[in-house]
Amino acid sequence: MNLAPSGALAPLPSLTTPPPQPSVAALPPIVAPQGAVVPGQAVLSLTARYGKDLPVISSGLVWRVFADRPDEAGTFKLVREDRGATPNIVLPPGGYVVHVAFGTVSAVRAVTLKSETDRESFLLPAGGLRIEGRVGSSKIPQNQISFGIYKGSQFEIGERASLLPNVAAGDVALLPEGTYYIVSNYGDANSVVRSDIRVQAGKLTDVTVTHRAAVITLKLVGDRGGEALANTAWSVITPGGDVIKESIGAFPRVILAEGEYRAIAKNEGKVFERPFNVVNGVDGEIEVIAR
């Protein structure tokens, strides 16, 4: 696994999850002129930084301003929403609750506005994590690999739910600064890799997860090099008898971690099998002879 932290986060690619959505009775958004001063109104000027001495966050923010008291239904009414980096929101004087979200990182603060400009700066110690997978020197296609992100280290005791269960390769996950571990699944069989990583505030960390596996195509044939027989039920098992993958078809493809296996084919009430080895990065066909 390669960790390659780069500099401060620039405007980021697509996020892997939408920002947290507070339970609100949403109103149509009202766009306030930037910096406009309206008689009898107040201006709420908002900014967010990665940390006390770190840069201003320039994109990816979602600001929501709520009433500071619930309505008759017990809901805190959404007053304004803005997706700008440094919005100036014009509001009547009074009390409000400001919520800002940046990926999975968020903060909330109560404010009291008077007939003047109130400048509020939030600290969101977040960093970006971008992951890709490789077999040998080859990049694994995005549609063949997925990543789950968990809080803490893989070596800590106890079960934990995933923070982000299905991150696509190349997407940027925005996370609070801290330690995480990645569970990488190449295919849907047994090629699984776990890696601990560290996310730093204001930085984009690129991680490459290396799998030792190959893509194997299974064929049941009457003779070597012959046509594959349709309607074949397949099982791939380990030498110890553990079932790794089951499928039905003439040409099933399975991604397997390197190692020793046995292919079992069932067709028209008959069972055929053969042992085979998977070598890292060497894709191939395994023919089982129907004899």
Describe the function of each predicted region.
Residues 192, 240-267, 271-281:
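C-terminal soluble interaction/assembly domains
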Residues 42-55, 129-137, 215-224:
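A short, amphipathic beta-strand motif
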Residues 1-41:
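Compositionally biased, proline/threonine/alanine/serine-rich low-complexity intrinsically disordered stretches
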Residues 44-46, 60-66, 96-98, 124, ...:
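Short, structured motif recognition centered on aromatic/hydrophobic residues
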Residues 82-97, 101-104, 166-181, 186-189, ...:
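Short Pro-Gly-centered beta-turn/loop motif in secreted/extracellular proteins
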Residues 52-71, 137-157, 223-242:
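Short, ordered, surface-exposed loop/turn motifs in non-cytosolic proteins
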Residues 20-31, 82-83, 102-125, 187-210, ...:
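Structured interaction patches on ligand/partner-binding surfaces of diverse proteins
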Residues 67-85, 154-169, 238-250:
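Short, acidic Ser/Thr/Gly-rich low-complexity loop/linker segments typical of extracellular
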